[in-house]
Amino acid sequence: MESVDFMAVDEQFHDDLDLWSLSLVDDYKKHGLGVDCYVLEPVVDRKIFDRFLLEPICDPVDVLYDYFRIHRDNIDQYIVDRLFAYITYKDIISALVSKNYMEDIFSIIIKNCNSVQDLLLYYLSNAYVEIDIVDLMVDHGAVIYKIECLNAYFRGICKKESSVVEFILNCGIPDENDVKLDLYKIIQYTRGFLVDEPTVLEIYKLCIPYIEDINQLDAGGRTLLYRAIYAGYIDLVSWLLENGANVNAVMSNGYTCLDVAVDRGSVIARREAHLKILEILLREPLSIDCIKLAILNNTIENHDVIKLCIKYFMMVDYSLCNVYASSLFDYIIDCKQELEYIRQMKIHNTTMYELIYNRDKNKHASHILHRYSKHPVLTQCITKGFKIYTEVTEQVTKALNRRALIDEIINNVSTDDNLLSKLPLEIRDLIVSQAVI
């Protein structure tokens, strides 16, 4: 019987406590106050706190921050856990980025985060990254796995910095799992989110030791070269080609880099850049199959693009341009005539065509043109005035101008009584030519 009385008293006590806590919460609400004010009380009662949580919470990170600030020596983990249920990684990152909080208090918040590692990856993907914030997370247990963190960083659409990539590579450790570097993601978005080309190129140069295969197809079935062409990044395209990118690679959809270069050359936006890229690709050793595929896949009507293709396709096989004969017959004839003329002009046991357009022989073109700058064939090139294969005229003109500058310098030096003027002409020519770019 006595036990029943004690139970009744206990129930009455809890009922009174419930009424009191409810009254307290109501009193707070009447004055427009909420849980954000309650956590400033010297003692935060769990039951009263839970009643406050029946209403939506605004800025839960602020509430948690204030709780830690007031109760840092008397923290109730129950209160912390209940608040964290309302806090997202986005909330924490937003608060971190704002830098409106004391670092020591915010360190406590990060320590109580479910996964500091996931918080780091979220930050890399969803914010403009600052190295000091990354350091703060590392101090609280996050690990910088090189490839995993780079992929998270490239995945985001915020501004990118090569300094962040360098930091990750220098301070990170090898990944525990076999993770592939998703370098393509940095330029896969629409134009508004693309990183500027100089920064992209810097990042690619930093990451090249971690690229297992520069011609590997990414998750979207494209190569890095394909992505760079689509983005219209001239220097990046050239750099990728210099580092082994295969211009004849076929994408998962059956298209090639030449296909996308031809297609992008027809767009209005950044037209000059895309035409320049198209010409860079056309100068590469394209396979017959790649060229035929580009002709088959592209039914463009842009004459600037078509003429550029004809100019270089004619170097491979005249018959490749038969498909364009109806609309650009005269241009094709002009190309053929200029090519035949260039292929007949010989200097130093090689033709002008090989000297200018052959990848192996044109490495020494400037030296040969300088050496034979007074050869009548070079004068013929200037007189002929090629309208399509203008590179011949440009290279020869550059060589002749360089020759004239060197001769002028030698003549000026020879008028003075100095050691250089006493040397044989051939030696003087060699010395001055090394100094003149």
Swiss-Prot record:
Q: Which family does it belong to?
A: Belongs to the orthopoxvirus OPG015 family.
Superkingdom field: Viruses
Disulfide bond annotation, renumbered to this chain: none
Q: What keywords appear on the UniProt entry?
A: ANK repeat, Repeat
Role this protein plays:
May be involved in virus-host protein interaction through the ankyrin repeats.
Q: In residue terms, where are the ANK repeats? A: 117-146, 220-249, 253-290
Indicate whether Repeat appears among the record's keywords: yes
**Name recorded for this polypeptide:** Ankyrin repeat domain-containing protein OPG015
> Repeat as a keyword?
yes
